[in-house]
Regions:
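C-terminal or late-domain output modules
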Residues: 110-151, 167-180, 199, 210-214, ...
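PAPS-dependent sulfotransferase catalytic domain
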Residues: 41-317, 331-350, 366-370
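Short amphipathic alpha-helical segments that mediate assembly, nucleic-acid/protein binding
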Residues: 3, 131, 220-223, 246-249, ...
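The conserved 3'-phosphoadenosine-5'-phosphosulfate
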Residues: 278-418, 424-426, 431-434, 438-444
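Non-catalytic propeptide/linker segments at domain boundaries
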Residues: 2-74
Length: 516
């Protein structure tokens, strides 16, 4: 069997690098491809493994080689979660899982998304990049799980990774134990079109550090300038310049016209049907829930149901009040870091001189984080929880110190601790105040329906996209679609519309359709 024949069986792209990898494992590949086990159980797979995955030592494996050899991602995660953006996967569910001992997740990231808060990670994330990163993260988290440091973790697929290797990536993901969360599509558009964003990075000299506050900055005035909304679309406001403010890509108020951008951005929204088809070969048992199952009093019982189904800890009765909270209210305001330097004046001190924000100030500051009880770090590193030292505006808040070294520095600086206590108290009140302000800016589903009434072409686009997005529900759970109050209103609005003509494009923009 030649290398070219092996590549043909595994659909491996011919390149010098891939050929070298195949040659390195050729003595294992040939007998495996000739075995009865391969012919019976694997030969019909679209991307069959080129060596026996059952005999693989994942911890000692090279992720780049594993990708070329079509080896499944290590299935050490407890379960898989998939769904669109704005169904709760990036806010509420992270917190609710953390309260049940599921404190970490691994995520696939669309092209252009950042794995970490560093400028170096702002490059495109291809299918192979995602595979290799997730491979490493799963191995790392499994070691923490085996050591007892964490109890459970999951794999989240809420970004759709689109490139030439999309089918391969998803075929190598085990989705045999899966949770799928769905929501009324009109509510999804309402959510993403009025989604507040907060600055994530702060430029200090030539470097970037996580965004945070300093003792001399008024918490009631400063960070409100760093909360903004995405306001760009393909047919409306296409000439906006990058930046924040009226007439730019970002603004301090949401714009219903951004619904168009989200509607057409199926890497993040409305890709449930595509994801369902991509994962279908390994999907065996889908636990289907709606966003509304995790709101108010229903949430606690829903999490008990998921705990029993997936085998993680049931929520504690003493935490029931937390499951009735709106996690999204503080999602984009926390965690908030306080850089506390002993020479910095408190913002309330009269006639004090504000220090220069530079590397020295940041590096020598004690880092205190105001977060919420939904932060998984509280349960993984409880020794960093110093909430009991503070008077907070709401019991949902919690306070973390970055390290034991910072804790020792704080114990030796009683004057600084006094300043920090005052600041954190005020900051918690400021965050609650800002959350209320942002809530007044929220759009409503009727705003989305009115927008669709104004733009018939967008109704045609929505109807076209929903054929794909609602595939699973239409096939297996049509009663859920029938229960979508606002989507049913959309159907009434669009009942006389002509089907979308793909050949005509969209206001000068070409339309392409990706099929799997």
């Amino acid at each position: 069997m030649t290398v070219e024949q092996i590549c043909q069986i595994g659909k491996v792209k011919i390149s010098d690098e891939n050929i070298a990898i195949i040659n390195q494992y050729k003595d294992y590949i040939i007998p495996w491809l000739s075995s009865d086990e391969f012919k019976t159980n694997y030969a019909k797979k679209e991307f069959p493994p080129l060596i026996n995955p059952a005999k693989l030592d994942y911890e000692g494996s090279n992720p780049a080689h594993a990708w070329v050899l079509n080896l499944p991602l290590p299935a050490f995660y407890d379960f898989l979660v998939f769904g669109s953006h704005a169904v709760g996967l990036h806010g509420a569910m992270i917190g609710f899982f953390a309260l049940c001992g599921v404190t970490r997740k691994v995520m696939a990231l669309r092209g252009g998304a950042a794995a970490n808060l560093t400028a170096a990670n702002l490059a495109n994330a291809s299918s192979q990049d995602n595979y290799e990163r997730m491979f490493k993260e799963i191995i790392s988290l499994n070691k923490l799980k085996q050591s007892g440091r964490i109890k459970h973790f999951y794999l989240q697929l809420s970004d759709l990774v689109l490139d030439d290797d999309t089918k391969k990536l998803y075929s190598l993901i085990d989705a045999s134990s899966a949770l799928h969360i769905v929501r009324d599509p009109i509510s999804v558009l309402k959510g993403v079109a009025a989604l507040p964003h907060r600055a994530e990075l702060l430029k200090v000299e030539e470097d970037f550090v996580p965004f945070g506050m300093f003792l001399h900055q008024d918490p009631f005035a400063h960070f409100s300038k760093h909360i903004f909304y995405m306001n760009h679309g393909l047919t409306m406001n296409t000439d906006k310049q990058s930046g924040v403010g009226k007439g730019k890509e970002m603004d301090f108020l949401p714009d219903i016209n951004s619904a168009e951008w989200w509607l057409l951005n199926y890497e993040q929204t409305f890709h449930d049907g595509i994801m369902y088809q991509l994962l279908a070969p390994s999907l065996k048992n889908i636990k289907l829930k709606q966003t509304t199952d995790f709101i108010g009093e229903k949430c606690f019982e829903s999490m008990c149901e998921l705990a029993d189904h997936f085998g993680f800890e049931r929520p504690k009765q003493s935490d029931r009040w937390l499951f009735e909270k709106r996690v999204s209210d503080l999602k984009h305001l926390t965690p908030m870091i306080l850089y506390a330097h002993e020479n910095s004046p408190l913002y309330t001190e009269q006639n004090s001189k504000a220090p220069e924000i530079n590397k020295e100030l940041v590096e020598n500051s004690i880092k205190i984080t105001l977060t919420t009880r939904f932060d998984g770090t509280l349960y993984i590193l409880p020794e960093l929880d110093i909430s009991s030292l503070f008077e907070l505006a709401d019991p949902v808040f919690a306070v973390l110190i970055e390290s034991q070294a910072d804790a020792l520095k704080l114990l030796k600086s009683p004057e600084l601790l006094t300043k920090i206590k005052i600041y954190i108290k005020d900051l918690s009140h400021a965050l609650l105040k800002q959350a209320k302000i942002e809530n007044t800016k929220k759009l409503k589903e009727n705003d989305v329906l009115a927008w669709f009434e104004k733009y018939p072409k967008m109704r045609q686009v929505m109807s076209f996209i929903m054929k794909q997005h609602l595939l699973l529900l239409r096939t297996h759970k049509p009663e859920i679609i029938e229960g979508y109050k606002y989507y049913q209103e959309f159907l009434k609005l669009s009942k006389d519309d002509e089907p979308l003509d793909l050949s005509s494009g969209l206001n000068g923009k070409s339309i392409s359709v990706t099929n799997f």
